[in-house]
UniProtKB/Swiss-Prot annotation:
GO cellular component: cytosolic large ribosomal subunit
Subunit structure: Part of the 50S ribosomal subunit. Forms a cluster with proteins L14 and L19.
UniProt record similarity statement: Belongs to the universal ribosomal protein uL3 family.
The encoding gene: rplC
Protein name listed in UniProt: Large ribosomal subunit protein uL3
Taxonomy of the source species: Bacteria, Bacillati, Bacillota, Bacilli, Lactobacillales
Length: 208
């Protein structure tokens, strides 16, 4: 069965194991998520739950949104997402960090930091040209392709806006769960800036 929860990235720190090994971890604060809707094959064509995270003021919600969350007896939510193939939860149920345990393998999704307009070296990792005084080629993108098509093919690696993309890191390990602080510690780094939305769910390729 799939497990999932929404949270906010707090930052990174490091912890030591009992053997003295240092592990870099990302701290994710996941206050209780509320199940707003249960979708089934009969009614919606697929099985999923819709969860809400992070309360917001009612004045920022319209009437349909208020009516939707009222079915779950909760406040309007800033973030609403779906998790497929989750069973055993009813509308109004809470999902806490205790859903996960140390040792679980998860996929973590976030929005990468925006870097603005960047060149091909930073954006795509291309090699630069000679930096000597006589060189006329330093940090340009280089060849645009062969002469014959008389055009540049779509998808050519060029300068442009970098970051701000939806990124998923697979098969990360849950190092520790702290229920009293609604915190999950995940091994390594995860995409996104501090305070950004993070989605944690059971790994699709765990054990492969």
């Amino acid at each position: 069965m799939t497990k999932g929860i929404l949270g906010k990235k707090v930052g990174m720190t490091q912890i030591f194991t009992e053997a003295g090994e240092l592990i870099p971890v990302t701290v994710i604060e996941a206050t209780p998520n509320v199940v707003l809707q249960v979708k089934t094959v009969e009614t919606d064509g697929y099985n999923a739950i819709q969860v809400g995270f992070d309360d917001k003021r009612e004045v920022l919600s319209n009437k349909p949104a208020k009516g939707h969350v009222a079915k779950a007896n909760t406040a309007p939510k800033r973030f609403i997402r779906e998790f497929k193939n989750v069973e055993g939860l009813e509308v109004g149920a809470e999902i806490t960090v205790e859903t996960f345990a140390a040792g679980d393998v998860v996929d973590v999704t976030g929005t990468s930091k925006g870097k603005g307009f960047q060149g091909v070296i930073k954006r795509h990792g291309q090699s630069r040209g000679p930096m000597a005084h006589g060189s006329r080629y330093h940090r340009r993108p280089g060849s645009m392709g062969p002469v014959a098509p008389n055009r540049v093919f779509k998808g050519k690696n060029l300068a442009g806006r970098m970051g701000g993309d939806r990124v998923t890191i697979q098969n990360l390990e849950v190092v520790q769960v702290v229920p009293e602080k609604n915190v999950i510690l995940i091994k390594g780094n995860v995409p996104g800036a501090k305070k950004s939305l993070i989605t944690i769910k059971s790994a699709v390729k765990a054990g492969k």
